[in-house]
Amino acid sequence: MLILTRRVGETLMIGDDITVTVLGVKGNQVRIGVNAPKDVAVHREEIYQRIQREKTDSEDDGSSV
């Protein structure tokens, strides 16, 4: 895992076309902005896990999403 330190307003690059910008810090919360191409899905981890779980559940049921 790469660990970086960024200040509010600073950006990091992932590849050539994804940027992650620190928008704000308040207490133990950090607001970030992600710019990525439309074909790249960006989700919070808990949402991604729910999507994966629903895919698995629908495959087990034999239905499609």
From Swiss-Prot:
State the oligomer form and interacting partners: Homodimer; the beta-strands of each monomer intercalate to form a hydrophobic core, while the alpha-helices form wings that extend away from the core.
Q: Which InterPro entries match?
A: CsrA, CsrA_sf
Q: Which Pfam families match?
A: CsrA
- Sum up the protein's function in the record's words: A key translational regulator that binds mRNA to regulate translation initiation and/or mRNA stability. Mediates global changes in gene expression, shifting from rapid growth to stress survival by linking envelope stress, the stringent response and the catabolite repression systems. Usually binds in the 5'-UTR; binding at or near the Shine-Dalgarno sequence prevents ribosome-binding, repressing translation, binding elsewhere in the 5'-UTR can activate translation and/or stabilize the mRNA. Its function is antagonized by small RNA(s).
According to its UniProt entry, this protein's organism is Chromohalobacter salexigens (strain ATCC BAA-138 / DSM 3043 / CIP 106854 / NCIMB 13768 / 1H11)
Name this protein carries in UniProt: Translational regulator CsrA
Family affiliation:
Belongs to the CsrA/RsmA family.
Tell me where it resides: Cytoplasm
- Gene label: csrA
Keyword annotations? Activator, Cytoplasm, Repressor, RNA-binding, Translation regulation
Instruction: Tell me yes or no: is Isomerase among this UniProt entry's keywords.
Output: no
- State whether keyword Signal applies: no
Q: What is the lineage of its organism?
A: Bacteria, Pseudomonadati, Pseudomonadota, Gammaproteobacteria, Oceanospirillales
User: GO:BP terms for this protein?
Assistant: mRNA catabolic process; negative regulation of translational initiation; positive regulation of translational initiation; regulation of carbohydrate metabolic process
Q: Which GO terms describe its molecular function?
A: mRNA 5'-UTR binding
CC annotations in GO: cytosol
